[in-house]
Amino acid sequence: MARSLCFMAFAILAMMLFVAYEVQARECKTESNTFPGICITKPPCRKACISEKFTDGHCSKLLRRCLCTKPCVFDEKMIKTGAETLVEEAKTLAAALLEEEIMDN
């Protein structure tokens, strides 16, 4: 009886962990354009990334580059700048709205 109770507790905790993992938003990363040199500590990298309008930044482990992060929009793999990003996001949004309209009918 005690073993089955422990197993059930473990199973519930494992399920909660998997559900919480799937709920997290995807995080897009790109190398900083303004950070100079080798990235050793997080604070200067984070400051450079925030100045580039990202939400956070950290040093890559192997290449020691400053990587800027922000939540992905529409599951895009790459972060682009300027009008190109706006056009792609508008196309993706239009496709999503069209799909929703088709599914409702």
UniProtKB/Swiss-Prot annotation:
Q: Does the keyword Acetylation apply?
A: no
SMART domains named in the record? Knot1 (SM00505)
- CC per GO annotation: extracellular region; vacuole
Organ and tissue specificity:
Flower. Found in petals, stamen and pistils, but not in sepals. In particular, accumulation in a configuration surrounding the inner reproductive whorls.
Signal peptide residue numbers: 1-25
Q: Which InterPro entries match?
A: Defensin_plant (IPR008176), Scorpion_toxin-like (IPR003614), Scorpion_toxin-like_sf (IPR036574)
Superkingdom in the source lineage: Eukaryota
Q: Where in the cell is it found?
A: Secreted, Cell wall; Vacuole
Q: Which Pfam families match?
A: Gamma-thionin (PF00304)
Disulfides per UniProt: 28-72, 39-59, 45-66, 49-68
The answer to keyword Signal applying to this record is yes
Which GO BP terms sit in this record?
defense response; defense response to fungus; killing of cells of another organism
Keywords of the record: Antimicrobial, Cell wall, Disulfide bond, Fungicide, Plant defense, Secreted, Signal, Vacuole
**What family classification does the UniProt entry report for this protein?**
Belongs to the DEFL family.
Quote the function comment for this protein: Involved in floral organogenesis. May play a protective role in flowers by protecting the reproductive organs from potential pathogen attack.
Q: What is this protein called?
A: Defensin-like protein
